[in-house]
């Protein structure tokens, strides 16, 4: 839809994004921030936290760089046959898992090697999983259900 059509159709606001930004790079552009604002999220806090993480990921010391640590952990796991990443989130942020699933899927899968993200899967018994999985647990601060965490610890 073009802006003229949107005005004609009575849209209250039109937000323009940079068309060259896409996919995994769009979270902090209007493509990601407008929906976040509509949801009532604190954009100032999101921007501040993103800046902190951006600075941390620019650290030249690999031991102090969380981006390097994450890439290394996932890369080594995949090299050792753990090519499935199961994402477990607390209920308040369950939609984050879908976004991470997309992010991982489009960021890996190069040169015939991929990490397959799995989201919204109910956790089963530990012995029901093959040794091809890596689990990540993301939760918000506060009260939480210990059952998924206990399963992951096993």
Q: What are the residue ranges of the model-derived segments?
A:
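Active-site phosphate/pyrophosphate-binding segments
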Residues: 1-136, 141-146
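Extended, charge-enriched "interface" segments that sit outside catalytic cores
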Residues: 142, 150-154
């Amino acid at each position: 839809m073009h802006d003229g059509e949107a005005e004609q159709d009575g849209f209250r606001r039109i937000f323009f994004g940079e068309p060259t930004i896409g996919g995994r790079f769009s979270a902090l552009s209007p493509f990601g921030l407008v929906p976040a604002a509509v949801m009532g999220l604190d954009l100032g806090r999101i921007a501040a936290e993103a800046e902190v993480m951006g600075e941390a990921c620019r650290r030249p010391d690999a031991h102090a760089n969380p981006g390097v640590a994450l890439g290394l952990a996932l890369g080594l796991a995949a090299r050792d046959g753990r090519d499935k990443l199961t994402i477990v989130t607390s209920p308040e942020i369950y939609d984050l898992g879908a976004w991470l699933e997309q992010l991982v899927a489009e960021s890996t899968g190069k040169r015939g090697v991929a990490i397959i993200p799995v989201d919204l899967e109910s956790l089963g018994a530990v012995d029901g999983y093959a040794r091809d999985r890596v689990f990540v647990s993301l939760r918000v601060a506060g009260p939480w259900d210990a059952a998924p965490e206990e399963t992951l610890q096993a």
